[in-house]
Amino acid sequence: MDGIIPLYKERGMTSFACVSRLRQILKTKKIGHSGTLDPGVAGVLPICVGNATKVVDYLMQSGKQYQGELLIGFATTTQDLDGDKIEEKVVADEIPTSEILSAMNSLTGTIIQIPPMYSAVKVNGKKLYEYARAGETVERPKRQVTISKFELLSSKYDKKNKQQRIRFNVECSKGTYIRTLVVDLARKLGYPGVMSLLTRLKSGGFTLDQTLSLDDVRDAVATQTLQQYLYPLDYALKDYPQLTIQVAQWKKVQNGGWLSPSELNTSEKEIVLSFDGQVKALYHFDPKNKMYKPTKMFAVN
């Protein structure tokens, strides 16, 4: 069994638990996911099965889309509702929409983020959350991410609790920490804040309406209809230029051979090569040797 399943990860489950359950349902160990979702986050989690595990990295390259909520008025150790409260500041008056929009605009485009201590980023071979659980703080590597859209959906002031809730939609590059983004938004507004809710709407080119739940997958296996829900591995490569090669070229590709631009009749920097209706390899142009060489082999048969 080979293909990609756009899974709907339910809130409360880890991404690893989803993979573990699918291994039991599909009776195969060759399964991987593209892009971890925190346990408290629901939404799109592309799962690669069998030979499709070779395209996990390419699925992860695509942009993401999220919808969520920022709760302004206090901060926690984890930047979400799971952590211990470490700071509090009442929102005495409703924050105007104009200020929220201005702050969101300042966080749109290319920005620098520092990963939260409660994250899986490794420093000196150890995950940050392991340091955090031990009560240690370490210097974290900065990363550059792109926020292509940061949209205000609604804003609601809670007069009784002196807090404010902001619902948002965000489209971003891989590696973006939404928790950090919304906490930074709260800081720009002059308050501590936490991410109170998050759903991933898009990942790996898949949207929420394409997803299957674990129960859906189990039912499809029972009725022997899963194949119709599996996406081919070339779905992960759909944004690359495509080229169908002939027998002579395929024999070279099978052996990892290099190909000349004249053989492929292309000037693309990277290109997906198919033969006999199946994606076989990803090649890239080597300017030094002026030849196309293999980046990744997907099938040699």
Swiss-Prot record:
Q: What is its EC number?
A: 5.4.99.25
- Keyword Lipid metabolism listed: no
Q: Which cysteines are joined by disulfide bonds?
A: none
Q: Which reaction(s) does the protein catalyse, per the Swiss-Prot or TrEMBL entry?
A: uridine(55) in tRNA = pseudouridine(55) in tRNA
GO MF, one annotated term: RNA binding
Assigned keywords, A-Z:
Isomerase, tRNA processing
Q: Which SUPFAM superfamilies match?
A: Pseudouridine synthase (SSF55120)
List the signal peptide residues.
Answer: none
Instruction: Indicate the enzyme's highest-level EC class.
Output: isomerase
Is Acetylation set as a keyword in this record?
Answer: no
Active site per the UniProt annotation: 38 (nucleophile)
Q: Known Gene3D superfamilies for this protein?
A: Pseudouridine synthase
Report any one BP term from Gene Ontology. Answer: mRNA pseudouridine synthesis
One matching Pfam family is TruB_N
Listed PANTHER family: PSEUDOURIDYLATE SYNTHASE TRUB1, TRNA-PSEUDOURIDINE SYNTHASE
The UniProt function text for this chain reads: Responsible for synthesis of pseudouridine from uracil-55 in the psi GC loop of transfer RNAs.
Family membership: Belongs to the pseudouridine synthase TruB family. Type 1 subfamily.
HAMAP family hit by this protein:
TruB_bact
Identify this protein by name: tRNA pseudouridine synthase B
Query: Native species of this protein?
Result: Limosilactobacillus reuteri (strain DSM 20016) (Lactobacillus reuteri)
Q: Gene for this protein? A: truB
